[in-house]
């Protein structure tokens, strides 16, 4: 079996691949390697990379059968599950474009997103999502087929556009038999400038905009994996998929990093069972949003408050040692000898047991992104022996911009520029980013595209930043900055973080 260092060496030498090409490569080299684990009714089911690639090819062939071709849009409206990523790979492999919808999107938003994207086929998770689209189906002339993953409650529906996942895959198998090289031929013709996925971002002054990320964007991100601050050095890494796959953060971790590191993606049973699933899976990598980390922090404190007097005493001693560990690592670096000793003792006193309950026992690298987080929350996890590196990115730059990294951490900042990233501040403090991962533009909105990408390729992020030494600090969204009567600029997010950690 291949080691992580060997994987990194291969990427450094040959570069990354588009997601579909990487899946094909792994399926050919390591067919029995486990790609997915999915929990249903308390039982874990496994899917190998060989089966993953085969099913993706069946998806591509079935889409061709229904008239889907290059540049056509295909939407997915579902919680995270193996079929989501299998479908995504199948769509991309035949040069079509994947459009993700949030499971919480109501009918009016489904109508807008499917209509604006001109999606030809929709993959819907269950009756709830099918009902949403059927409610507005007369407004969606481009939509020709609705494939549902779960059939409960739908089998009695009488609509010629509906087809089950199993039936769809069977059609794909039959088409595959007619031309086994179809998907591979389409895949070989992919150009780097072709759009691979479309991610809709909420509009504050208008409807959501469809950000077009190209195969070249995704390939460039994959090429950066050995140098990114939030990848793991652990062999056979385990991931827990719970961040929405229609969001760029979830897609970055699962679709690009998870697959390129040949990891196993474990799917949380639901967003409500994330904590339980974490404790069971014990992943190697933990990407998180502040809300999850805040909840874990609060839960740990409550757990200790309700513990026995002895456990409370041990936790208090471990916390004091953990504080020393965090302070030393921030000042002296990850390899500091004293920090190693204090962390070792703190783990014996109870932190190891707490990390296991939180599902962080095997995590050697964790990342916080997508929203600002309080430095106190980061300090808590660092004292626990789980350094969480805050990073910064957005849909329009493929989620790659800056990040704290081992040996280079400053709490309250989003770190330094990731390798291959050019960064500068405009005169008004707006953060400008330039790299090969900057998106192609907004779908059917050239005016908005010109507002955020200048003629030299610089992306205007809309975020205001400032430097703290060599580290970048996000002040706030440019449009959210409050100017007081005294002329002072005040950041609402800074006020929010102070409130969150206030007793």
Identify the residue ranges that each predicted region occupies.
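Conserved pre-ATP/AMP-binding loop-to-beta segment of ANL
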Residues: 31-34, 162-166, 173-200, 207, ...
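Conserved AMP-binding/adenylate-forming core of the ANL superfamily
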Residues: 32-89, 106-111, 164-167, 213-216
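Conserved AMP-binding/adenylation subdomain of ANL enzymes
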Residues: 219-241, 245-351, 362
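Conserved AMP-binding A3 loop
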Residues: 46-50, 196-222
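A short helix-loop-beta submotif of the ANL/AMP-binding
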Residues: 57, 73, 79-107, 115-121, ...
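Structural core segment of the AMP-binding/adenylate-forming
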Residues: 66, 93-171
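Conserved ATP-dependent adenylate/AMP-binding module captured primarily in the ANL superfamily
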Residues: 105-138, 221-240, 271-285, 357, ...
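Conserved ATP-binding/catalytic segment of the ANL
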Residues: 417-484
């Amino acid at each position: 079996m291949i080691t992580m260092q060997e994987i990194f060496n291969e990427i450094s030498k040959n570069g990354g691949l588009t997601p579909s090409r990487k899946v094909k490569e792994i399926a050919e080299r390591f067919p029995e390697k486990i790609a997915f684990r999915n929990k249903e009714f308390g039982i874990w089911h496994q899917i190998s990379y060989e089966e993953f690639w085969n099913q993706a090819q069946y998806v591509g062939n079935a889409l061709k059968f229904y008239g889907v071709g290059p540049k056509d849009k295909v939407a997915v409206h579902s919680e995270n599950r193996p079929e989501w990523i299998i479908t995504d790979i199948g769509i991309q492999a035949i040069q079509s474009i994947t459009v993700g919808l949030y499971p919480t999107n109501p009918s009016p938003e489904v109508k807008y997103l499917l209509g604006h994207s001109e999606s030809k086929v929709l993959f819907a998770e269950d009756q709830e999502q099918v009902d949403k689209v059927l409610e507005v189906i007369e407004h969606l002339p481009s939509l020709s087929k609705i494939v549902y993953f779960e059939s409960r409650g739908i089998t009695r529906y009488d609509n010629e556009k509906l087809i089950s996942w199993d039936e769809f895959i069977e059609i794909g198998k039959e088409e595959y038999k007619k031309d086994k090289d179809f998907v591979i031929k389409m895949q070989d013709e992919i150009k780097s400038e072709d759009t691979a996925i479309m991610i809709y971002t909420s509009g504050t002054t208008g409807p959501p905009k469809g950000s077009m990320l190209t195969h070249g964007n995704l390939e460039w991100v994959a090429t950066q994996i050995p140098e990114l601050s939030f990848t793991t050095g652990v062999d056979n890494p385990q991931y827990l998929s719970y961040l929405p796959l229609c969001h760029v953060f979830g897609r970055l971790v699962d679709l690009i990093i998870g697959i390129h590191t040949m990891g196993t993606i474990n799917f949380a049973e639901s967003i409500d069972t994330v904590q339980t699933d974490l404790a069971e899976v014990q992943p190697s990598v933990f990407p998180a949003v502040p809300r999850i980390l805040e909840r874990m922090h609060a839960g740990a404190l409550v757990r200790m408050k309700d513990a026995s007097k002895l456990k409370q005493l041990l936790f208090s001693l471990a916390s004091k040692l953990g504080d020393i560990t965090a302070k030393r690592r921030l000042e002296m670096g990850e390899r500091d000898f004293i920090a190693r000793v204090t962390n070792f003792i703190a783990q014996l006193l109870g932190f190891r047991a707490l990390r296991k309950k939180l599902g962080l026992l095997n995590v050697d690298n964790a990342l916080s992104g997508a929203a600002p987080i309080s430095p106190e929350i980061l300090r808590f996890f660092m004292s626990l022996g789980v350094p969480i590196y805050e990073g910064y990115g957005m849909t329009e730059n493929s989620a790659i911009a800056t990040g704290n990294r081992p040996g280079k951490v400053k709490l309250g900042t989003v770190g330094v520029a990731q390798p291959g990233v050019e960064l500068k501040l405009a005169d008004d403090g707006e953060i400008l980013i330039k790299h090969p991962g900057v998106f192609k533009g907004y779908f059917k909105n050239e005016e908005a595209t010109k507002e955020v990408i200048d003629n030299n390729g610089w992306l205007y992020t809309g975020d205001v930043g400032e430097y703290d030494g060599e580290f970048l600090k996000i002040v706030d969204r440019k449009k959210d900055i409050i100017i007081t009567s005294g002329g002072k600029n005040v950041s609402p997010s800074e006020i929010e973080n102070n409130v969150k950690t206030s007793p």
